[in-house]
């Protein structure tokens, strides 16, 4: 065998080895992403199932933890006035409104999960537990707010939440002071906005909790995509 033949054969073996490694890496990357997506979709399903049930929504600590400061201030003021029952009614109205956001939230989140890339996976490996949810939040939070806020606003208007709160506060304009608005539309929009924020952030809290519970599975599946 002459020198040229040996050189060509060596190059062929090297090329074959590189191609094989690339195929293995590609296949492993696909498997790792599939595992990641499956876990995130599981977290989304878990969260939206909670949103679908008023009592589950009310009882969930991760959703309660997402309550914006403005609504905390409203509730604190009502409680100081001895209106605990009204605080509970407000929470129930928000929980009922949440059930109407499930159908618009699901496709937004599902599409975002299905569009995750190997670059996203590499960032998750570097960032550790919770990073996948953070990426999902970056991709979808604005879109979710835009999609669910009108539904929340319509339901809270239907329930007459603002007028109920204003009547309870006897025209003192405390609600306007707390929410930074004066008109009825501003007050309704304020409560709807903050309720929508609670829903979006509460949903991501649930997804992140699910991700963290499955952190070792995710990391093991993505280690080959570093």
Report the location of each language-model feature.
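Mid-length scaffold segments of soluble, non-membrane domains
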Residues: 91-155
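C-terminal motif of bacterial Sec signal peptides marking the signal peptidase cleavage site
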Residues: 18-22
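Bacterial N-terminal signal peptides that target proteins for export
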Residues: 1-9
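Post-signal-peptide N-terminal segment of Sec-exported extracytoplasmic proteins
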Residues: 38-79
């Amino acid at each position: 065998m002459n020198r040229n033949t040996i050189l060509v054969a060596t190059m062929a073996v090297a090329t074959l080895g590189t191609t094989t490694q690339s195929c293995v890496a590609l296949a492993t990357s696909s498997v790792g992403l599939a595992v990641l997506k499956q876990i995130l979709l599981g977290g989304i399903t878990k969260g939206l199932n909670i949103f679908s049930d008023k009592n589950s929504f009310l009882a969930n600590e991760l959703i309660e933890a997402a309550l914006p400061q403005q609504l905390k201030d409203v509730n604190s003021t009502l409680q100081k006035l001895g209106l605990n029952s009204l605080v509970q009614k407000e929470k129930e109205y928000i929980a009922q409104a949440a059930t109407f956001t499930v159908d618009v939230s699901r496709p937004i989140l599902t599409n975002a999960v299905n569009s995750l890339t190997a670059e996203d996976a590499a960032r998750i490996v570097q960032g550790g537990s919770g990073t996948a949810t953070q990426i999902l939040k970056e991709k979808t939070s604005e879109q979710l707010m835009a999609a669910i806020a009108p539904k929340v606003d319509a339901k809270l208007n239907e329930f007459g939440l603002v007028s109920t709160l204003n009547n309870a506060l006897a025209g003192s304009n405390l609600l306007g002071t707390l929410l930074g608005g004066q008109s009825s539309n501003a007050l309704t929009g304020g409560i709807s906005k903050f309720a929508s924020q609670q829903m979006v952030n509460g949903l991501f809290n649930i997804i992140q909790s699910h991700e963290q519970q499955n952190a070792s599975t995710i990391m093991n599946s993505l280690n080959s995509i570093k």
